[in-house]
Amino acid sequence: INFGVEIPRLKSIADKHAKNKELATALWQDNIRECKMLAIYLMPEEHSGEIADEWISQTKFTEIADHLAMHLLCRIPRAADKALEWIEVREGMFPYCGFMTLSHLIRRGIHLDTNQEHRFFESLCALTCSEDSAVTTRCALNTGIRYIENTPGSECRLKEHTSNKNPQPVIPQYILQDTEE
């Protein structure tokens, strides 16, 4: 069910209440868009790691996934590692939430270590050969572009990583040229 309440109004409602795990959990159980959004805004950060997998598995729409990634998932302990795990699940909204979480982490200035970067590149390569949804593919490519734009040398490492595995470039050359300017 979607009542069409605007995001700013939902945030205003949430701002009037203290963060509360029990209330957030109860709101999440209702299959109503506005309740799920309020649940995301009201869940205390220290409990976000406990509910992450469960809430992702129950998420059906990208709007909810976007807010879940932005407001909760990118704040859990070891968020980059968890995001890479979700990407590898390859079912439901897990890959989408994983890429969105990575995108928010990159925007906040985190840097992937060598192992994380390798896993990220592997996921991008696998995506070009998969049957994932267009929405997940677009999200993954946008995350890849954001990573390249914010991580010096990553474009070269991505090219090296993919040259022997995939004859098609993971991120088309015309997009990479735009990031170099």
Predicted regions and their residues:
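Alpha-helical scaffold domains
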Residues: 1-181
